[in-house]
Amino acid sequence: MSDSGQECAFVVDGLTYRGIEWGNPEGPLIIALHGWLDNALSFSVLAPHLAQFRLVALDLSGQGHSDHRSADATYHIWDDVPQLLGIVEQLDEGSVIVMGHSRGAAIAVLLAAALGDRCSHLVLLDGMLPIPAEETAAPQQFVQAQRDREAARTRRRRHFTDVAGFINARVKLGFSESSARLLAPRALRPHDNGFELTHDPRLNQASAVKLTAGMIAAFYASLSVKTLV
């Protein structure tokens, strides 16, 4: 397998998840989940150090080259889990190492809980489950999600005249120039003599429901897997 990895794709529940596979096809399987508005290329720097593993880095739904969810769907951190379980089944491995970065780390915790004993190790990079929500804030959170959804109906997709425009925009958000340049091939697609973002704009919307402190503690307590944070 080349240093640049090999494209892969999985169809589950009518959604196509695309990604990149690196390493040893016969090695222990790692499912790698990227952060918010990133894509599978965020693991390309780490991949050479994991050459003995079968590293499958996925573009989560609505990001990179993977399908967007249907118009009536949402992007809560648990929404990808059923499809990720389906991908694990398609890969047909007895056990799996789950690795996630940032938002992907939160999803990784939920996936590990759902996999149970099939998850041999859990690796959380710069993230865990989200900061817990106060129960009293639930109505406000729910209403904000509805407002965001309504506002998005008339919002135009971000457009860039060139790749440099995307890189500069990411740098202004606090990302390094090198990381922005790394992600660009899967973060952009050609459009109107320039480029537009590939991610679903709904990923910018507030979640309608968030986990409370008690719920988060219960998820952590349910895990018995070896975990690296």
Predicted regions and their residues:
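Gly/Ala-rich beta-loop-alpha elbow adjacent to hydrolase catalytic centers
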Residues: 100, 104, 108
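Alpha/beta-hydrolase fold catalytic core
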Residues: 1-30, 51-54, 92-94, 129
